[in-house]
Amino acid sequence: MFFRSIFTSAMILFSGSSVVHGANSPGCGKDLPRVQEPGGSYSTNITTKDGRERSYIIHIPSNYDKNEPVPVIFSFHGRTRTAKSQEKLSQFSNEEYNPNAIAVYPQGIKNQWQGDPSSQGIDDISFTLQMLDHFEDRYCIDRTRVYAAGKSNGGGLTNRLACDPTASKRFAAFAPVAGAYYQNVTEDNCRPNTVKIQCNPARTPIPMLAFHGTADETIPYTGGGRRGRCLPSVPHFVREWASRDDLGGKNETTTTNGGKVEVSRFGDHGEVVHYRIEGLGHAWPSTEPNSDNPDGTYVDATPIIMGFFDQWTL
């Protein structure tokens, strides 16, 4: 019932966000691109500034009005996955969860993102900002309500956007799931509970909501050396964000589901929140079976993310 109430509150709040907030983008008043209609998802190409042909899927909410600014949610897939699989996994195109925001699912080059140890020097932060420029020019966007979420390597990119001095000024809040926060430290020198996390946001606080399962064998909760790099432990990652946001070391921790779900909130307004899910593997949390977890788990990440995003604007 607790998580159902979060879901209901999130839908009520988010459904009114375009009325409450009004930082209109230049795209307000323009018709949708040809072949695009409210309620549909469309695969689209874009040529980046370095001449690369990139792609993404964009979902237009059914009630989209070219004169009413709406939020935008970027959702980044995990390594080896695709924009299409991320749309299905994260469910931001499901209007039961997200009735109003445009949802965007970018496609990584070779199905991976900047920050992965095998990435080929592609600047995905620049790519993301170029997409955002394009959307603001072409659609009616509330520029104070742009958000990023992602799974695994996509969660790592979500964190990199939060840490980037330019991107952090254009995104209001961030939600990595089972994030891969690789640091440029060798495995031999990896100290997961103390490793320095490279991060230079241009503002504080940066709202951050992080989900992670204790049984994640791909990106272990305890961190450690992997693929030649160093993964911070998830508690260290979360504490560093609380410190960076000047929230102090104290947090309020609650448990549900017989202690299987632990929720830690830092700051008077919960600027940094962490969901620790006992026994969950490398998965996007859902009470229903999904492509990550055929058995489901104790909580639904997507409506919780929607409720968190609704708290924050630039």
Regions found by a protein language model. Give the residues of each.
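Active-site machinery of serine-nucleophile hydrolases
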Residues: R79-D137, V272-H274
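A domain-start/cap signature at the N-terminus of enzymes
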Residues: F2-F7, L13-V72, K84, A101, ...
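Active-site glycine-rich loops that stabilize anionic/oxyanionic intermediates
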Residues: V70, H77-R81, L280-G281
